[in-house]
């Protein structure tokens, strides 16, 4: 089975210039904890609810003025939609990741895969 068979395809994005307040609002509205960050050139980072808590709330940054780009993870770990699920799951476990951005072979965002996706498919 391939990652493309189990990943979530309709992914919500946030732009790096948006505020954390805006990004957190999207997370609340869509009940998600992970947002890929993209600009006109493509995927430039990721933002999680944990990033917001540890890198913004705990140090007292203002969510209304702090930009997503200020705290996002820009060293992106990802997989491809045509990779086998077993290998990707092993990599996620080794790196202690809950979610991964999924790219197609043209380096475009194709979706997101989470540990929940594996469980939902009995993997």
Briefly describe each language-model feature range.
Residues 1-11, 65-76:
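Bateman (tandem CBS) regulatory domains
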Residues 53-66, 118-123:
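A short, polar/charged loop-to-alpha-helix boundary motif
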Residues 27-30, 35-51, 92, 100-116:
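A glycine-centered beta-loop-beta connector
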């Amino acid at each position: 089975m391939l990652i493309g068979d189990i990943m979530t395809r309709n992914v919500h994005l946030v732009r790096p210039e948006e505020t954390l307040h805006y990004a957190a609002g999207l997370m609340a509205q869509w009940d998600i904890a992970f947002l890929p960050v993209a600009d006109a050139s493509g995927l430039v980072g990721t933002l999680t609810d944990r990033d917001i808590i540890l890198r913004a709330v705990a140090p007292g940054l203002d969510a209304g003025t702090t930009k997503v780009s200020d705290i996002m993870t820009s060293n992106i770990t990802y997989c491809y939609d045509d990779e086998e699920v077993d290998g990707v799951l092993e990599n996620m476990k080794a790196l202690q990741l809950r979610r991964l951005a999924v790219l197609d072979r043209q380096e475009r965002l194709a979706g997101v895969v989470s540990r929940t996706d594996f469980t939902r498919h009995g993997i």
